[in-house]
UniProtKB/Swiss-Prot annotation:
Species: Methanosphaera stadtmanae (strain ATCC 43021 / DSM 3091 / JCM 11832 / MCB-3)
InterPro entries from the UniProt entry: Class_I_gatase-like (IPR029062), PRibForGlyAmidine_synth_PurQ (IPR010075)
Protein's GO biological process: 'de novo' IMP biosynthetic process
Location(s) in or outside the cell: Cytoplasm
Enzyme Commission no: 6.3.5.3, 3.5.1.2
UniProt subunit comment: Part of the FGAM synthase complex composed of 1 PurL, 1 PurQ and 2 PurS subunits.
Protein name: Phosphoribosylformylglycinamidine synthase subunit PurQ
Amino acid sequence: MTDVADVNVGIIRFPGTNCDRDIEYAVNLVGANSHYIYWNETDLSQMDVVIIPGGFSYGDYLRAGSIAGITPIIDAIKDFAKKENPVLGICNGAQILGEIDLVPGVFIENENAKFICKSKKLKVNTTRTPFTKLYKKNEVIDLPIAHKEGRYYTDNLETLYDNNQIVLTFEDGNPNGSLDNITGVCNVDGNVVAVMPHPERAVEKLLRSEDGLKFFKSFLD
């Protein structure tokens, strides 16, 4: 078990990020240290984990995550991931990870072209990532979603199954038209995870569900 007091989590902030404080709360709740890292910084050497929050980086102009994907911090995130360090992108963070090719596929506009905000039942398809290893395989969890561009698509679906890269799928109906109900994927190595649902909004029973807490406890295990 890692000494949580020694774990430093970098929370990336872009103009338009708005879920950073929720993630800070979740990280601190499990006892790790949270640090805000801004879009124009280039050093992640003191971090053990990087989390890219949700929000609307740069107003989601052009395409969700596209402008954030060319900022100075991106090369540092790529280098961090290349060393097999844990990287988690949530909602807009997941879109950014798709934009910079750290995970396969893309998250595009919902089939109904509307913003969807609701709680969903999700299946944990793999426990091999740093963020899901405390769950049971095929465990069903309750997490909120809140997005307009959350429909997952890839040309390489068979490869995802072959490599065990599907992290989360919708279990109680597909709200946005995602391919094969997919709402979370990882890279081949499993250290980079992109999920559209918000685990940081489900860390206490007061918030309806605490099913997201293991996302943050897992990287400490």
